[in-house]
């Protein structure tokens, strides 16, 4: 499983900025071993294990980008129309060794290979046909409406770098260069638990002081979106020995174990102690809100080579979501061999005033709407408690307030990250 040292998550500062957290993950966590070859149709969501090199050029040959007439640019008059003899006809896919001679045009269709010697194509809408001749206007640039072999990707170039998380466009490129299979990293195996004496299975018997488990479903869905194989290990009660036993057993066969709840300093918060008893634990007080301290560690199973990374998230579902996308996701990507992701929050106008503490990154749940002038603006959800799940279902994404910002006024611009951006 994951090759982690006891102190890989150790950090001595007071509040760890997010950028430092990302750097620590890059420096101290190594991707898991294990590569498998998958057919292209099953490759979406997987991570390329090596650079994928183009065995052929894309496109493989010079071809026409339009339906029209292929010509030799050197034949064209700079002063007015040029009359050319239509000497042939080339459909897409037609094998031909047609070569164009001076004074000729070849009728050509989109995707057809350019005749040898032709370098420019007129669109059929722009020419005048008269029997076997065609009159083409002046002013078209050499190379117009033509696509050149390798202009998309030369043969031998890197089509997809190692660590690419394959999505539809990457699979399409691999297919376009003729590949049928790709070497990808094996899927990560992740175990999840919920903790808490008050937490019960949805659909199960619920006594008056119990709540249905939301976090395991949140975590399973987030992890599966990122391509992990999830083992759902259920709900653990707030019992130190039971927790330690369950966590120890879970390390076997898993790269990562994620729990929610029980990590703060209440009397029923035993996750810290349980992890310390069976492995090593550090607390990352990350400079992020929402998201109280996140427990990071390594847990060891019965046999010596069975170890897994551990992340203990807070219990409140919104805090679970934010700490997952900002802390667990970078760790998961690193373990999976994926390149680090750079998020680009898009500036949107805020419709509200907001104050925050300096030196921490803050995330605010917002909906987007059109302002009276038609510009997009962000509206804060009226409830900002970390336990308010509808504040996630009724909004579009998170505004990201940078560390150095302390207040914004209506009309200011703040970076917006959609839930889709955050979860991918
Ligand atoms: P804790 O960190 O264990 O004190 O939990 C903080 C809050 O999150 C408490 O109100 C818990 O009831 C709630 N909570 C913990 N686990 C879950 C869960 N799996 N689903 C929904 N809410 C939870
Ligand atoms: Mg609890």
Task: Please report, for each region that a protein language model flagged, where it lies by residue.
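Helix-rich terminal scaffold detector
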Residues: 1-18, 180-313, 317-323, 334
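Short, glycine/charged-enriched hinge/interface segments at domain edges or termini
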Residues: 2-19, 69-232, 237, 377, ...
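Intrinsically disordered, low-complexity, positively charged segments
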Residues: 11-73, 77-81
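Generic structural signal for well-ordered, non-membrane alpha-helical segments
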Residues: 14, 18-22, 36, 40, ...
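Flexible glycine/proline-rich
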Residues: 19-22, 36-41, 50, 63, ...
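Structural signal for hydrophobic packing residues in well-ordered secondary-structure cores
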Residues: 29-33, 51, 114, 157-163, ...
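Solvent-exposed alpha-helices and their adjacent loops that cap or buttress functional pockets
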Residues: 62-64, 76-79, 97-101, 114-116, ...
């Amino acid at each position: 499983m994951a090759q982690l040292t006891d102190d890989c998550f150790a950090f001595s500062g007071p509040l760890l900025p997010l950028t430092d957290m990302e750097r620590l993950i890059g420096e101290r966590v190594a991707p898991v071993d294990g590569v498998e070859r998958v057919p292209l149709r099953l490759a979406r969501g997987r991570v390329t294990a090596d650079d994928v090199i183009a065995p052929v050029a894309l496109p493989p040959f010079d071809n026409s980008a339009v339906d029209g007439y292929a010509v030799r640019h050197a034949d064209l008059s700079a002063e007015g129309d040029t009359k050319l003899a239509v000497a042939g006809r080339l459909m897409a896919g037609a094998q031909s060794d047609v070569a164009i001679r001076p004074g000729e045009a070849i009728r050509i269709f989109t995707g057809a290979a350019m005749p040898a010697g032709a370098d420019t194509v007129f669109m059929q809408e722009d020419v005048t046909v008269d029997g076997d001749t065609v009159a083409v206007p002046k002013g078209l640039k050499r190379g117009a409406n033509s696509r050149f072999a390798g202009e998309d990707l030369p043969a031998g170039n890197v089509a997809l770098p190692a660590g690419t998380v394959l999505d539809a466009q990457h699979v399409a490129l691999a297919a376009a260069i003729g590949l049928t299979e790709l070497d990808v990293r094996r899927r990560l195996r992740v175990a999840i638990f919920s903790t808490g004496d008050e937490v019960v299975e949805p659909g199960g018997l619920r006594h008056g002081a119990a709540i249905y488990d939301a976090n395991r479903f949140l975590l399973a869905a987030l992890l599966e979106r990122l391509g992990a194989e999830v083992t759902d290990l259920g709900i653990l009660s707030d019992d130190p020995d039971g927790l330690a036993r369950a966590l120890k057993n879970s390390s076997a066969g898993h790269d990562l174990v994620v729990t929610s709840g029980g990590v703060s300093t209440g009397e029923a918060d035993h996750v810290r102690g349980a992890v310390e008893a069976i492995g090593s634990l550090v607390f990352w007080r990350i400079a992020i809100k929402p998201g109280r301290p996140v427990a990071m560690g390594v847990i060891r199973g019965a046999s010596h080579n069975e170890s897994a990374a551990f992340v203990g998230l807070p219990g409140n579902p919104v805090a679970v979501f934010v700490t997952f996308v900002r802390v667990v996701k970078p760790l998961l990507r690193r373990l999976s061999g994926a390149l680090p992701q750079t998020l680009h929050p898009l500036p949107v106008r805020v419709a509200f005033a907001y104050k925050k503490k300096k030196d921490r990154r803050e995330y605010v749940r917002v909906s987007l709407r059109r302002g009276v002038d038609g510009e997009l603006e962000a509206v804060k959800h009226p409830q900002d408690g970390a336990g308010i799940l509808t504040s996630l279902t009724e909004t579009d994404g998170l505004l990201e307030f940078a560390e150095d910002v302390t207040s914004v006024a209506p009309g200011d611009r703040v970076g917006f990250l959609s839930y889709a951006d955050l979860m991918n």
